[in-house]
């Protein structure tokens, strides 16, 4: 019925009983992903790089799936190593939904960017610059919007929201209620 799924490298390797599935990766997810893994390289903690279509470059490490798109579109390609120019991240439209496959372990800023792009594409509100481990949940109904702002850390956190600064004590939650 729609939605967005993000799968990462090694998805589909094992079944629910922890037994290896003896098929080409991503095994049972191949039709969802719209691609298959042509080859992979366990690079450990050495860094490789990937490039998005806008030219921005991000580091990746540990594992590099060389993806062969079938129905999926390429979101990013490897920018180094013997697989330079090969697909690293895909997006596939499946039914009414979208499936992303990230074939490597990326730096945090790339994950943040991918999630932000997905949120914007799906119309889900996104707060730029939200500190790590601070979350905002919004509920609406009966002409009211209620936002719950959680600090899930043991340190004081501050953030800008609607042009004003909000300071949160360790593990504090604040509620912001507005009429719509």
Task: List the model feature ranges, each with a label.
Residues 1-180:
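A conserved amphipathic helix/loop scaffold
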């Amino acid at each position: 019925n729609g939605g967005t799924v993000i799968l990462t490298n090694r998805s589909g390797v094992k079944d629910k009983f922890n037994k290896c599935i003896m098929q080409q990766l991503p095994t049972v997810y191949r039709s969802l992903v719209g691609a298959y893994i042509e080859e992979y390289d366990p690079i450990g903690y050495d860094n490789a790089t990937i490039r998005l279509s806008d030219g921005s470059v991000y580091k990746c490490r540990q594992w590099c799936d060389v993806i062969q798109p079938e129905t999926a579109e390429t979101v990013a390609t490897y920018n180094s190593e013997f697989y330079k120019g090969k697909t690293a991240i895909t997006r596939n439209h499946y039914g009414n939904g979208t499936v992303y496959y990230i074939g490597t372990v990326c730096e945090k800023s790339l994950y943040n960017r991918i999630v932000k792009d997905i949120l914007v594409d799906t119309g889900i509100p996104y707060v730029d610059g939200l500190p790590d481990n601070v979350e905002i949940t919004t509920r609406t109904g009966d002409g009211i919007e209620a936002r719950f702002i959680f600090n899930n850390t043991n340190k004081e956190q501050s953030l800008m929201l609607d042009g004003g600064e909000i300071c949160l004590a360790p593990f504090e939650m604040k509620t912001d209620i507005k009429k719509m």
